[in-house]
Structures are given as C-alpha cells and as structure tokens.
Amino acid sequence: LKDIAPNLPVVMVTKNEEEDIMDQAIGSKIADYLIKPVNPKQILLTLKKNIHQREIVQEVTQTGYRQDFGRIGMQLSEQLTPDEWKELYRRLVHWELELASTGSAMDDMLRMQKEEANATFAKFVKRHYEHWVQHPDERPLMSPDLFKRCIFPRLTAGRKVFLLVLDNLRYDQWRAISGELADDFDIDEDLYYTILPTATQYARNAIFAGLMPLQIKQMYPDLWVDEEEDEGKNLNEKALIAHQLERFRRREQFTYHKLNDSQAVSQLLTQIKQFAATSLNVLVINFIDILSHARTESRMVRELAGSEGAYRGITQSWFKHTPIRQLFRQLAELDYDLIITTDHGSIKVDQPSKVVGDRNVNTNLRYKLGRNLSYNAKDVYEVREPKALLLPQPILSTAYIFATGNRFFAYPNNYNHYVQYYTDTFQHGGISMEEMLVPLITLRPKRR
C-alpha cells in the first residue's frame, strides 16, 4: 500500500500484541495501531484523527486565539512589568506559530494585535529605559548583565559553559529550531532585554564587555569604534571578554571563535575535542544576520524569505541541513552547559518615517545619530542627552532617535525609490518586542 499510495493513511487492526510487530508497524509509518477487541469510539477517533485532523486543529486553534485575543487586549491596557511583557510576547509568538501551522485566516487579526502591542511596548521602553540604565540593580536582565548573572555563577559552581551567540536570532526563529534539539538536550527557555540601539556594534560589545557602550569607550578607548569611523565595529570582542573576566577576577581560560559560513563550522568541528579542557568557550555565528541583509539586497533571497513564516523556514532549514546541527550533537557529548542567545532581533518594516540630517548621519534604518536631525517626534524615541543612556556622543550636539513599531527612516531625497526598496525588509536598531526581547536558552545534555 505504501508503495502504491505513499500518502494514504494506513491503520493496522490486529489481535497480535507482540512488541516486534508493533515496532515493524511503527517503523513502516502507519497512521495508527489498534488491538482487538476494538471499541466503535476508537474507530471514530482514528477516522477523525486521520481524515479531519487539519480542520479540527484549525478550528480549535482559532477558538483558542479568539479567547486569548481579549485577554491580551485587556493586558495591553494595564501597566505591565518587564516579566509580564516577556510573557505577553511569548504568547503572541505562540499564536503566530500555531496559526501559521494550521493555515488559519486570522493572520490579519494577529498582525494588528502585534502592532498594538509594539506601540504599547515602545511607550513602556520610553518610560523606563533611562531608569534601567542608571540603576542596574533595579532593571530586568539586559545585555551587559549576561556574563555576570548567567555565565559566571555556572563557572563558580564548577560547570563548563559554551556560549553560542547567533547574531540576529529572534524568539520565533528559536522556536522554529528548538524541536531539532529536544532529543539531545533538556531545554530551559527565557528572554532578556537588549540595550539600545538594537545593533551589533552596541549590543554585542555590551554583552562581551559587561558594560554599556559609553563605559566601554571611556574604559577601553582603543577597543571602541565610533559610527563615523570606517573600520569594523566588532573586531575587539575577544579582548572585551578578557577584560570582563579580569574585572571580575575570574581566572578561567576561554576560547573565542567567530564563524560566517558552513565551511568555518566544519573546520571548527575538527577541533571540538580541544574545547573539553576549557571552562568557557564563546562562539559567534553570523549566518542569520547575513541572511537578513541578503534578503534586503537580493531579489531572489527576498522571494525565498518573503514572509515571517518563510524567514523562519529558511532559518530552520539552515539549522537542520548544515554542520551547525552536528556541532550541537557533539556538544551534547561534552557535558557542557550550552547557552544560546543573541545580541538583538529584527522586525519586518513597512512604514516609512521621514528624517533629515547632514551627510555624517549613520545609515541604519531603525536608529539615527547626528546633529540637526529633523523627524516626526511621534514616530521615535528621541534622546537629546545620550550620556543619560550611557551612549557615546561623538560630537557635543549629537542626538539619537530610535524608530518604534514597524517604521523605518527614509530621506526625502529619492524618497519613493528608497521606500519601495526597503519596505517589507527585516531591519534592527530600534524599539520593538522582536528586536529587544530576545532568546536566552540554557541546554543541558540529556543523560543516556
């Protein structure tokens, strides 16, 4: 039957209870296995499961979201705490994945609720962010706190730690790949808040230094590169890690590697056994960030990753079919605490917001810094005193603005071309749940 009609569900009904028969049936991918005597309701359940499952799952999912829609809406009218925002974002991502998997027609309803949530989240960040920066003991876990609060305690407890930073990994992308790891690891999921701007130069350096950007520039001026300079902005990460370990009087040896393609991962796999002697190993993988930028610049990649679901699908396919999957299998054998995180997420933008500045203004579409910026104040979080947020101020009159929601900055010159080119691209640097609430995952190898 499977040879003739491979997609036809086959249900085996038998009196035979021998385990090897069951194993053969399961190995042949039968749809169900019933042992006589069979109750009529068992037959009905099997028929429903194999003939009407899609419709039933879709109906139950839609009903579940309709019920939760009202509860989420009520929450958005309240003053949520940082932890409550994390939980609300988890629920929105849960429904996004559930509705996408059932082909539901409720996508527009969810999209509008996410836009409302992001507008409220931006107000929340504007209200609290400066206080978080100025009072580290009163803030949620943020980029500069990761080593101090997540990694050092494990090292102190005698655990070996492997920190894997997947640049530009969003929470929904993590959920898409997490199923690939469930057989090898016990998974503990959390989210943390990135700093602003949600860009690699700032957020990843803050993670590795354990400091805010202005503090890095003041303490290690030779390791910080300002926006207007041409050299790479993240070339000193290993040195920043070393300085952070030194500041906290940690004596552990560490390794650091940055990988941009599958070939580099394959090469690393040949050295994996050498990591076993090192307490802390740090690995940065840039594939998702490269994919995000390629999607903007390449028409073909934009078509392949045209929607949020397609973007997740490419991430999942990359994880499943490249040496990165083998890397995780080998790490599972080394008995490490494996921490997966990222420096920032990204958001699909489709609302242009005009901005005017001089020629020295940076090129990022979600945040700008410079002098004499002209913009729509309702569209941004404006920071006229960067030092209050511990951000560098290359010139005394430099101000920062951060885009909120799904907006992106566009210049009046050649405006229509600019808008058409960047609409529906994934960008980062501003304020949204997708950019700021990012995965912090702990994996522990399962005992065999």
How should each PLM-predicted stretch be described?
Residues 17-19, 24:
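Generic alpha-helical hydrophobic packing signal
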Residues 19, 39-44:
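Conserved two-component signaling phosphotransfer/partner-docking surface
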Residues 14, 36:
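A Lys-centered signature of the CheY-like receiver
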Residues 4, 15-17, 50:
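Short, conserved "switch-loop" micro-motifs in signal-transduction and mechanochemical regulators
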Residues 12, 23, 32, 44-448:
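Feature captures the catalytic ectodomains and active-site-proximal regions of enzymes
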Residues 1-7, 28:
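Conserved phosphotransfer cores of two-component systems
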Residues 27, 32-35:
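Accessory nucleic-acid engagement/destabilization modules that flank
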